[in-house]
Amino acid sequence: MTLRKQRQEIYYEFTSSSFEITSPPESSKITLTNLYPILVRPYVPAVIPLGIRIIYGNKGQGFILAGSSQKKVFCHTGLIDPGYRGEIKLIVLNTTKYNVTLFAGELRVSLFSFFFSTPIIYDYDLLNRPQYSDDAGYDLYLQEDLMLFPQASTTVTIDSRVPTTTKFFKPVVFGRSGLATRGVVVDVVKWTHSPLTLKIYNFTDNTLRYSAGTRICQVVFVHRRHFPSKLKHFFTYINLNSKTSFYWANVSFVDCQNDAYRSLVTLPCQEDTDRGYRGDSGFGSSGMR
């Protein structure tokens, strides 16, 4: 029996018969692929249960869920808060006017971890602090009314200063899962200068209107270690979009059901809960509202 890797551990449970995990045990990133065909209809987001639940994680470490396929679909890049204990689901959207079938092995899914901070931000009306104590994302509000036309993308400008409070953590914008389940997704982007430019997609067949003050996306203060430097070609990284490359945290994802080392010391039986604890409410991060 080989010794366990000496790094932070994240425990998860996997119960799906529709997906298989393709990453090795104790990998720093969980990868999955579908075992059966998945039908993605036009204009209607497909919410796909993956059979994964995070059982125990570490404070200050969130998760990112990403998907990819060669077919004409768009996978919402999901932010999963460390306190979320519900089943993790991938949101897939059809980019065409016709049914798209993802046959076995054509959908690839990744779940990985990152370090974040939730600093206190003063005099900033557009950001709202995380709803739960373990949440990573600050809600960002629209400055003015927004209209999204069917099957089209729109560029939105947020004319506001960069809310950076420390050089070690950089603000990154993620879309909201609640909007993605309604067909509206936002490109992941680093907030490096002012004004902030967002690219928003409407994959429905309806014109959608959002008033000023609507929660349109989330801002997460991600540790700068996760962004490639000039040495990026010497490390393994993932592209969150065409412009944002990302290193995931060097942790061990441990399957609770197949863990030869499992003990009461390494895996607490029950986590402390209070009113500020997310549990299985919401959709992993920003909720459904």
From Swiss-Prot:
Requisite cofactors: Mg(2+)
GO molecular function list: dUTP diphosphatase activity; metal ion binding
This enzyme's EC code(s): 3.6.1.23
One GO biological process term: dUTP metabolic process
Pfam families membership: dUTPase (PF00692)
Enzyme class: hydrolase
SUPFAM superfamilies for this protein: dUTPase-like
Binding site for substrate: R176, S177, G178, F283, G284
Reaction catalysed by this enzyme: dUTP + H2O = dUMP + diphosphate + H(+)
Function: Involved in nucleotide metabolism: produces dUMP, the immediate precursor of thymidine nucleotides and decreases the intracellular concentration of dUTP to avoid uracil incorporation into viral DNA.
Family: Belongs to the dUTPase family.
Protein name listed in UniProt: Deoxyuridine 5'-triphosphate nucleotidohydrolase
Organism: Equine herpesvirus 2 (strain 86/87) (EHV-2)
Gene it is expressed from: DUT
